[in-house]
Amino acid sequence: MKKQNLRSMAASAIEKVVEQGQSLSNILPPLQQKVSDKDKALLQELCFGVLRTLPQQEWLISKLMSRPMTGKQRTIHYLIMVGFYQLLHTRIPPHAALAETVEGAVVIKRPQLKGLINGVLRQFQRQQEELLAEFADSDKRFLHPEWLLKRLQKAYPSKWEAIVEANNQRPPMWLRVNRNHHTRDEWLALLETAEMNGFTHDAYPDAIRLASPAPVQALPGFEQGWVTVQDASAQGCMTYLEPQNGDHILDLCAAPGGKTTHILEIAPKASVMAVDVDEQRLSRVYDNLKRLGMKAEVKQGDGRTPGEWCGDEQFDRILVDAPCSATGVIRRHPDIKWLRRDRDINELAQLQSEILDAVWPHLKPGGTLVYATCSVLPEENSQQIAAFLKRTSNATLRTTGTPDKPGVQNLPGAEDGDGFFYAKLIKE
């Protein structure tokens, strides 16, 4: 495999996220196919790391360069950020970080700027201590966009700093043991045999947190469906959905299929319809079902128009894993901070409201609907459910909060899980 310049690849990917609004989860996998296995993790670290600390990198450039790079030279702007990130946040020897970053200018076809890149990075090395001290007192130190900080400060006056700090950390790797193959303790023993360590959590009966992240190929029985990568908070949905054998269950907004397969692990004889609006992402649902040896009825469809894909069908249980701002999973997807806009929140809340109203008639009397998001914003969560309860006379809240403050809100980093919201509704 031809040796690639990872720094230039990372710079191009970061530019596409920040300048073009593309998602890193779409950009990164094809790039990783071009590099050796040992370089895949470094490429991901450079992309995730720069996006996690973007305001710091932008601030440093503003201090060390008289004017920003524009036009066709714009990628160099992000290449310099990749250089800063390596010097500040990785164990890469400084001489190697500098050499590889400067060489990236050749790959980007801007060899005439090698001297500029080298000069800026070396100047940073000389002034690093005083620059970082100044940054620590700047309003950029929280590494979040201003609109999101304001919303977090309003919603969580005493907790917003802890949320921000959790968002800026690297996430742990959580797994879900397939109880149809092994008990959690049995699989934990297999993990230890493979010379890896994991920890259990009392609140999540199938969950194991790895002591340190590992490639899925290294996990015992991953290809055979013994275990799935899924955050503990996402696993928590089943605490409220409580799927049973014989149930007819709708998993709405189902891609990539983590919750669909969890339902079938708990209730193998349930009949499950998994629906998502994004046809491309449904391929992940099929992949997960195949790996785990499970069957579900998979359909492409819009949650606002269920009549188009299920007629007048009714379900015993419905999981609405609603499209949301994903502000609870920023530590896993740091590009969210730069892809989301303040105006998106009201639009998402409206979409969620329309989905709830549309699917409620498809829940059988006495049935359970669990509304879940990976957001921490009240507009998408407690306020959304409070408004739904107010306008829906036959909906009752169960075991998740109170009518004036409905739902259960997990905050990022609490018990090492992602930020997640759940509300359990019963149809009278």
Curated annotation (Swiss-Prot):
Give the transmembrane ranges.
none
Q: Which residues bind S-adenosyl-L-methionine?
A: 253-259, 276, 302, 321
| Protein name per the record | Ribosomal RNA small subunit methyltransferase B
Gene3D superfamilies the UniProt entry points to: Helix hairpin bin, NusB-like, Sun protein, domain 3, Vaccinia Virus protein VP39
Catalysis performed (reactions): cytidine(967) in 16S rRNA + S-adenosyl-L-methionine = 5-methylcytidine(967) in 16S rRNA + S-adenosyl-L-homocysteine + H(+)
Organism of provenance: Enterobacter sp. (strain 638)
Which residues does the Swiss-Prot or TrEMBL record annotate as the active site?
A: 374
Coarse class of the protein's main subcellular location: cytoplasm
GO-annotated cellular components: cytosol
UniProt-listed Pfam families: Methyltr_RsmB-F (PF01189), NusB (PF01029), RsmF-B_ferredox (PF22458)
